[in-house]
């Protein structure tokens, strides 16, 4: 009997379009000799819509349903995703997806799911909290200033100018895929950048700009985590923003990255240490800055990295000899392992 995968996609965050792209890639990469895939779309308003079911490989013309094509008569209660023995793959990016919200819901339903648990998902989603945890683990971070809604913005800008040097980057603390991030070269630009960032979150991180290469490491495992050789994001733009990543296609990737063996070793060790520090499970992608001075800064941990066919995470593992279909199988097995461990602790 085939294993059922419940594929959740869409979502309420600004990253829902990336989620659809990732979910379509997963849908096509699944080994249908072993799995059946049932899909549920989460609308921007938070409604759950039962969409398609695939018992064999979809054709090239098959597309996952989205806001424009779903049948709203198939709206269901969120709990309708429950199926005994099924494993949920929440291909959801950003708030209300990879921030612990959906993970908590799935634990209430008593369903195994791919990826990090409630705590590690919510922790990694918040850039400010992540920095504080990784600092305690002794992992180098880019200098930063945290700003919370209600703070005196003028005073905080003065703190930024005292502790950091332009250019700086303002980022919503609780957002991914470079949404709401902008670069500032002076005080007026910083004020505008803060306004943009506060549209997406009530907590904002202002980071020192660094002249650096962007290097990424893939992580896979629960309690015995493994890492990939690093890959590098090679940009044709000054700033790797949302449009550059997903719309304009102005990036290429070097896999493996052209860096020394010593730097590779440090990055892999730091990535594994960071994953353990947040209590990671299943998977993550760890992003580093490697400066022209030879400094290595851990930028962020992404607990549900992009899963499109051109995304770094699956390509990193492909370079390690693990194909996209095999990667999905391993993630499903890891989900069942962590579920069994979680249930065993409820004594």
From Swiss-Prot:
It comes from the Bacteria. Residues 131-333 form the ATP-grasp domain. HAMAP family: Dala_Dala_lig. The keyword Transcription regulation does not apply. Pathway: Cell wall biogenesis; peptidoglycan biosynthesis. Cell wall formation. Keywords: ATP-binding, Cell shape, Cell wall biogenesis/degradation, Cytoplasm, Ligase, Magnesium, Manganese, Metal-binding, Nucleotide-binding, Peptidoglycan synthesis. ATP binds at residues 161-216. It catalyses: 2 D-alanine + ATP = D-alanyl-D-alanine + ADP + phosphate + H(+). GO terms for molecular function: ATP binding; D-alanine-D-alanine ligase activity; metal ion binding. One of its GO terms (biological process) is regulation of cell shape. This is D-alanine--D-alanine ligase. The keyword Ubl conjugation does not apply. Mg(2+) 1 binds at residues 287, 300. Mg(2+) 2 binds at residues 300, 302. Binds 2 magnesium or manganese ions per subunit. Its main location: cytoplasm. PANTHER family: D-ALANINE--D-ALANINE LIGASE, D-ALANINE--D-ALANINE LIGASE A. Its cofactor is Mg(2+); Mn(2+). Belongs to the D-alanine--D-alanine ligase family. GO terms for cellular component: cytosol.
């Amino acid at each position: 009997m085939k294993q059922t995968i419940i594929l959740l996609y869409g979502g309420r965050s600004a990253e829902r379009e990336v989620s659809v792209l990732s979910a379509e890639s997963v849908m096509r990469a699944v080994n249908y000799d072993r799995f059946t895939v049932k899909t549920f779309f989460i609308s921007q308003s938070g409604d759950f819509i039962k969409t398609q079911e695939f018992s064999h490989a979809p054709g090239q013309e098959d597309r996952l349903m989205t806001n424009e094509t779903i049948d709203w008569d198939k709206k269901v209660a969120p709990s309708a995703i429950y199926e005994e023995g099924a494993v949920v793959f929440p291909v959801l990016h950003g708030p209300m997806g990879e921030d612990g919200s959906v993970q908590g819901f799935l634990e209430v339903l008593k369903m195994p799911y791919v990826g990090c648990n409630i705590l590690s998902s919510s922790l990694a989603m918040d850039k400010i909290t992540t920095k504080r945890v990784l600092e305690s683990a002794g992992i180098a971070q880019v200098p930063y200033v945290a700003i919370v809604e209600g703070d005196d913005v003028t005073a905080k800008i003065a703190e930024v100018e005292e502790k950091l040097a332009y250019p700086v980057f303002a980022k919503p603390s609780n957002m991914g895929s470079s949404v709401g991030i902008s670069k500032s070269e002076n005080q007026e630009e910083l004020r505008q950048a803060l306004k943009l960032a506060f549209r997406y979150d009530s907590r904002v991180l202002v980071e020192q700009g660094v002249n650096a290469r962007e290097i990424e490491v893939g992580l896979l495992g629960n309690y015995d985590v493994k890492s990939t050789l690093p890959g590098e994001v090679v940009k044709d733009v000054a700033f790797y923003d949302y449009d550059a990543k997903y719309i304009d296609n102005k990036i290429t990737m070097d896999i493996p990255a052209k860096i020394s063996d010593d730097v590779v070793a440090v990055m892999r060790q730091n990535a594994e240490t960071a994953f353990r520090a947040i209590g990671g499970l299943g998977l993550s992608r760890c992003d580093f800055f490697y400066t022209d001075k030879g400094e290595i800064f851990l930028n962020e941990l992404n607990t549900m990295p992009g899963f499109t066919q051109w995304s770094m995470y699956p390509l990193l593992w492909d370079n390690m000899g693990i194909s996209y279909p095999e990667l999905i199988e391993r993630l499903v097995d890891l989900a069942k392992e962590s579920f069994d461990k979680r249930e065993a602790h409820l004594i």
